[in-house]
Amino acid sequence: VDTAEKLSKNGCASNYGATQISVWSMARALNASIPPLTNPMTPSMTFRNSNAGRISGVALVGVIIGGALALFLVVALGVVPYFFLHNTRDNNLAPKELTDPVTLIFTDIESSTALWAAHPELMPDAVATHHRLIRSLIGRYGCYEVKTVGDSFMIASKSPFAAVQLAQELQLCFLHHDWGTNAIDESYQQLEQQRAEEDAKYTPPTARLDLKVYSRLWNGLRVRVGIHTGLCDIRRDEVTKGYDYYGRTSNMAARTESVGNGGQVLMTTAAYMSLSAEEREQIDVTALGDVPLRGVAKPVEMYQLNAVPGRTFAGLRLEHELLNDDEDQTTTSCSDHSSSRTDLSVAAQTIAASLQSLLGTFTPAQRQKALIPFCERWRVPLPQKVGNVWDNDGCQEAIRRVAAKVGRVMDFGTRKASSSVTSLERGGSLFSAGGATVATVASSSNFSCVDGRCGTVQLIDLENDSTTS
């Protein structure tokens, strides 16, 4: 009992360990007077795991899978929302106070209809790049994208200087971007040469420049920009969940943009004087004097922002503004959004009827699937849909919008073709870019496009074929 109590005190009663260990002989086991072979001792027991500090294969696989899942969650919860929000309007940046002046920016691509007619395979990607570059600048300068219509942007800013910086950087950004082709620049130069041949008083600002000089000043799409500052009627659109700006300020900004040339930035005196003296010292402007604008009672004092030093421009497009010429309309004032059947040209109505007949046997879901690529490639806004599938009205609206855009391009080609045929009848020649002598003649259906790129056309080799149909 004494031994058991002693062992209990030493923590060995449950046989969890041993203390006072000694080695006895068999004789000692039979005779207690014989001493043990070794003196009693309590060893220090340290247990070691041979796999300590190592990871098993199964555990390693688990760590890899867990790490991959964690990385996926970071991407899903962080990066994806970033890109989603990056491509949407941030209403926090929208000017909302009715008593605070708003600076509005309107942009438009010069000769976009002609470019679509000449390069239908290039323009979808070029316009997508145009949108991406401008949206990156909107975010950089804390401005607000009000809307895009076709090739045009309407942008609002609480800060006049931020708006001016955006417009200046836009021109530099487009100049230094790699567009991957010279076709757009060649088309702009050809358009200038054609106008010079038709108008003896017109001097092409870029078509006759030395190649090295041209490359320092011009590259890719040419975007004209108009800026105006003033009070607006501000409304929140319950459909788009965004803010829109109405009234005289909006009209003035749009008119300012419409008289400019591609690559030119115009601002009204109201926008220029909204800048502080220090801000005005940071920009280079040229006073253009009073400029008459359609729908404005008195001429408006205008300034040109010299975003790219050395650029020269043709005279302001006052005749286009006053006559409301529709060859190269400012798409913010003539939208693809509302294209009723009666508003469509003959060519556009034929396109719409063809699409309706072609897709009439499809279900709404199939029609939507077929129409979306056309809308995306022609940069036509999609109709508002109810649920996941467009209804019949939505499909009809998409068809009308596509037909309106393509119809304008085809009408442009028809006018150019008619002009070319007229010049040929007078003894002139029309040469294609590759050097072959050709003429584009509209067929009886009035469908044609520049260089036979779309529609129903006839190409005639003037040297080898003297007959026409």
Swiss-Prot record:
Co-factor binding comment: Binds 1 Mg(2+) ion per subunit.
Keyword Magnesium: yes
Top EC class for this record: lyase
TM spans (from-to): 60-80
Domain Guanylate cyclase: 103-257
Sugar-bearing residue positions: N31
Major localization class: membrane
SMART domains found in the cross-reference section: CYCc
Catalysed reaction equations from the record: ATP = 3',5'-cyclic AMP + diphosphate
EC numbers: 4.6.1.1
GO biological process entries: cAMP biosynthetic process; intracellular signal transduction
Binding residues for Mg(2+): D108, D151
Necessary cofactors: Mg(2+)
Residue intervals annotated with topology Cytoplasmic: 81-469
Subcellular location(s) per record: Cell membrane
Keyword DNA-binding (UniProt): no
Job of this protein: Could act as a receptor for an unknown ligand.
Protein name stated in the entry: Receptor-type adenylate cyclase
